[in-house]
């Protein structure tokens, strides 16, 4: 049995906003989603609890700040209603408007965590028109509040600045998204944002994207840089911070090469199951999940289904209490 921490849903308001904007800027399609389809895939994957989230580009598809805040509120209320109807089977990560709209974002974090009792908060890898990744100084108040609350933060990639496709066969989520996750993770590490605000537990989508593969490259070179580019941390300090703060989901990443590298890099207890339903093709989701079930345990640093579930229970006290007591908790 599994707890799925990377699992999307499409409230009607979000679907309508995407359609009004001409679709996802990344080039990905808008998949069908209903609660019935959701429950069917959960049964197929042996998922007992699903943490819902709104995928990229999220509420910022509405360009007006007030409209984006209203869309985030509608998405969060929709998620809470699903959770309230089946609290042992569902939870959710809250949506927020653009982090540049600090007051609006902080208010939605407060509302979602205090009044709706969300299990965490979704942030996207980049906001605005420029290279504004999550270590940007404008986002420091957001990180300070999330750290104060010791929140679980689910980081999901969104489209890069350049939305031009390599070709029609490669919409950006297919290959570019993992690079965006690696970029924002390294920005958080090199900006000092994570060391300043240590209270957050941060889930990186898709096995951390390119971070586990490339972090040693950057961490080894950074201490050798000239003073104006030297962040004052040793290689081991950079690696230790990443291992301490970051968790990683397996969504669309469960294969021998990727999971072997991730298991060697991640701190024990920091790998979680994720499906990426409904955005990934169903057959691909099933194939990746079967690898987790049937082959991952045999890897050199084996990853078992039981361990993935226990890791999630440790991260989400509500679910751990429900498991211990045998009753749903909100």
UniProtKB/Swiss-Prot annotation:
Question: Which pathway, per its entry?
Answer: Secondary metabolite biosynthesis
Q: Which reaction does it catalyse?
A: 6-methylsalicylate + H(+) = 3-methylphenol + CO2
Q: What is its EC number?
A: 4.1.1.52
One GO BP: secondary metabolic process
Q: Where in the cell is it found?
A: Cytoplasm, Cytosol
Keyword Hydrolase in record: yes
This entry carries the following GO cellular component terms, namely: cytosol
Q: What is its main location?
A: cytoplasm
Q: Where does Zn(2+) bind?
A: 6, 8, 156, 276
Q: Which InterPro entries match?
A: ACMSD (IPR032465), Amidohydro-rel (IPR006680), Metal_Hydrolase (IPR032466)
| UniProt KW keywords | Cytoplasm, Decarboxylase, Hydrolase, Lyase, Metal-binding, Zinc
The molecular function terms of the Gene Ontology recorded here are: 6-methylsalicylate decarboxylase activity; hydrolase activity; metal ion binding
Keyword Zinc recorded:
yes
Q: What class of enzyme is it?
A: lyase
Family affiliation: Belongs to the metallo-dependent hydrolases superfamily. ACMSD family.
Q: What does this protein do?
A: 6-methylsalicylic acid decarboxylase; part of the gene cluster that mediates the biosynthesis of aculins. The pathway begins with the synthesis of 6-methylsalicylic acid by the polyketide synthase (PKS) acuA via condensation of acetate and malonate units. The 6-methylsalicylic acid decarboxylase acuB then catalyzes the decarboxylation of 6-methylsalicylic acid to yield m-cresol (also known as 3-methylphenol). These first reactions occur in the cytosol.
Q: How does it assemble?
A: Monomer.
- PANTHER family recorded for this chain? 2-AMINO-3-CARBOXYLMUCONATE-6-SEMIALDEHYDE DECARBOXYLASE, AMIDOHYDROLASE-RELATED DOMAIN-CONTAINING PROTEIN
What protein name applies here? 6-methylsalicylic acid decarboxylase acuB
The organism is Aspergillus aculeatus (strain ATCC 16872 / CBS 172.66 / WB 5094)
